[in-house]
Every structure is written in C-alpha cells, then in structure tokens.
Amino acid sequence: VETSFVPMDFLTANIELLDEKKAQTTYKIEYVSKYVEKWLFVMSNVDEVKNINFIDCMCNAGIYKDGDKGTAIKVLKLFNDFALQHTDKTFNLIINDISPDRLRIITTIINDYVGVKATNINIVTRNMDVNAFLSDEEFFKKYFNCYPKRSSNLVFVDPYNFCTVKISMLEK
C-alpha cells in the first residue's frame, strides 16, 4: 500500500465522495496499469503512431478513501513518463464520470498533485453517463481520426458497473 500523494486535509474534505477500495479494485488497478505500461512501450515505439489515447469511461474521483490512486491517475503518471521520452507523440487522457463532484476532485488532483511535466499530454474531461459518452461519435472522431490510422486507442470501462454499459456503443 502506497502513502497518499495528496494532503490529508484534501482527503478529509472530500471523504464522503470517495469510495472504499476493495481487494479486487487493487488488483484491477495493478493489472490495468501493467497492461497500459506495456501498451505504451509498444505504441510509443511505433513510428507511424502519432496519437496515443487512453479513455477512462468511468474514472471516479482518481483516489480512494485510503489515499491510493485510481486507474486514471496511474495512467497519467505512465503517460508523463512516456511522453517525456517520446516528444514526437501526443498523449490524450480522456476521463469521463457522471458525477461532477468526482470530476472536480480528479481535476484538482491532476492540477495540484500529480506534477505532469510533459507538454505533449492533453487531458480532456467529460461529465456524462457512460452510454451517452460512448455514443458521442463526433467527440471520438476528433481523437481517433486525428491521424488516419496513426492513433492507438485504449478504451477502459471499469467492470464495477459494466452491466450498465451498452456493448454496442463499444463496437462503434
């Protein structure tokens, strides 16, 4: 278990909006982070790929009650490491959550505590229901078609509420 990277007063002030972390959540974050790291290693070394997109469809607050980082924050830290080494690529972290309060928390964490140093990272936030978000074709075209056949995209839908996701939206 890692030490919280945000001040205790920030955690305390937002504790009612944060989730308890279950054992399977720890494993999920670990597995997704390891997968993303391997994906980034491969895609950032493919000359033709210029645009690397990670989309977290239900990002939550970015932190848990115990102070551990959520998936989107872990991915952002990986993006920062890879973006500093691969300045010819653009890294887009697209995060969505239905709760404006949780988006406020994750945005504050990103802006105040993560310490992104790479200038080739874009962070885009959306406040939508997961199905409305996934069906917003114009939005996704903007990121997926920036460089025809030159984007690598990873869409993450947390299995926590996966039963609410319309699979047909992912197929598009």
Model-predicted regions and their roles:
Residues 1-17, 22-24, 42:
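N-terminal accessory segments
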Residues 28:
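Hydrophobic (often cysteine-bearing) scaffold residues that line and stabilize catalytic clefts
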Residues 6-13, 111-123, 160-165:
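Short flexible/disordered coil segments
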Residues 125-172:
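Active-site segment flanking the S-adenosylmethionine/decSAM binding pocket
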Residues 18, 31-139:
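SAM cofactor-binding core of SAM-dependent methyltransferases
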